[in-house]
Amino acid sequence: ADDMMSFIKSDIIVFGIGVFLFIVATLWFVFRKLIWIIVPISSCFFSVIIMIGILGLLGWKVTVISSNFIALMLILTMAMNIHMSTRFLQLRENYPNKNISELITLTTRKMFWPILYTVLTTVIAFLSLIFSEIKPIIDFGWMMTLGLFTSFIITFTLLPSLINFVPKENISLVKYEDSKITSYLAKISQNNNIIIFTITGFIIILSLVGISRLEVENSFINYFSKNTEIYKGMKLIDEELGGT
């Protein structure tokens, strides 16, 4: 049990830090301004904190399966925040005479339905997990569903409030020169339709063959390293008492 708790805590820390660094790098690549890294990350941070508090109040326990919900929440919330922030900056450029409050209102109106549809489709995917017969998987489905709705609410409440405090001189969209990579890929897709469809069809066939060869791993003991106490204990039970 002690090993199990250690693994869960380790996963939360490792994946949390990894996702945080990835998010910072992504935001810097997109916005190139420190303030536009701080604002979306603050929104993500509060979403996760609120969700953890809700789980605590509901008495839901984090398991090996659901231990990565924080990393998933950060990624999904960040996607919403980037859409909102980018749209706000685009509207700022298109309507320079409007004040910040008007731009925020316009942004939320334009982005509400697109982001809502995105959230609902993702929620449906996670809700499919509740039809499993394994309780930790069912709980994970409910956790992510609740987490997505929490992130959605934060994106349309806290994020606009934070944007309202951004200094005016930092409200501008970074202009990029035409990318050689995207131009090259565009030419390939326009001039090689038949080849692309042929390769895609071949890959689909290979994927179907691979799917037919998938096997389910039902040995819980193999989830852990051989030098851990939990592995040694379960191996002893497997060999001496007929299985875990």
What annotation goes with each model-predicted range?
Residues 186, 213-244:
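Solvent-exposed, non-transmembrane loop/terminal regulatory segments of multi-pass membrane proteins
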